[in-house]
Amino acid sequence: MAKKIEAYIKLQVAAGQANPSPPVGPALGQRGVNIMEFCKAFNAKTQGMEPGLPIPTVITVYSDRSFTFITKTPPAPVLLKKAAGIKSGSGRPNTDKVGTVTRAQLEEIAKTKEPDLTAADMEAAVRTIAGTARSMGLNVEGL
């Protein structure tokens, strides 16, 4: 018989840097999950990724206090900021442009994000990422 699901917990945790401090500790502690067990498993799974990159994670907590978790790809704005070499997006994206990204950079980000995007093909995925870039105040070259 399948285990009864008690809760889903959605967190963004830095790759390879999960520790019992907030936000991880309180979110898991409320549900009675072994926090250190999650931290060790998460850090082991994200070992090959760039340290500090925020990773969206969905943790499924079962009634017997066990858990499973799924890691997703880093958020597109984080990848775009890294590609453009900027700290943050524009406060007024239509008037103040803060950087530029090329089509090659957009394709690279779209390939990284492909498992989490609902785009029909790679061209649609690139256009989706380009829209995110424009909404952050980045110029898009090559589209």
Swiss-Prot record:
Provide the Gene Ontology terms for cellular component. cytosolic large ribosomal subunit
* Record bears the keyword Ribonucleoprotein: yes
Keyword rRNA-binding applies: yes
Q: Name one GO molecular function term.
A: large ribosomal subunit rRNA binding
Keywords, A to Z, come to: Methylation, Ribonucleoprotein, Ribosomal protein, RNA-binding, rRNA-binding
Modified how: One or more lysine residues are methylated.
Gene Ontology biological-process entries: translation
Query: What NCBIfam families does UniProt report for this protein, alphabetically?
Result: L11_bact
Q: How does it assemble?
A: Part of the ribosomal stalk of the 50S ribosomal subunit. Interacts with L10 and the large rRNA to form the base of the stalk. L10 forms an elongated spine to which L12 dimers bind in a sequential fashion forming a multimeric L10(L12)X complex.
Which protein family is named in the record?
Belongs to the universal ribosomal protein uL11 family.
Q: What does this protein do?
A: Forms part of the ribosomal stalk which helps the ribosome interact with GTP-bound translation factors.
Q: What is this protein called?
A: Large ribosomal subunit protein uL11
Q: Which organism is it from?
A: Marinobacter nauticus (strain ATCC 700491 / DSM 11845 / VT8)
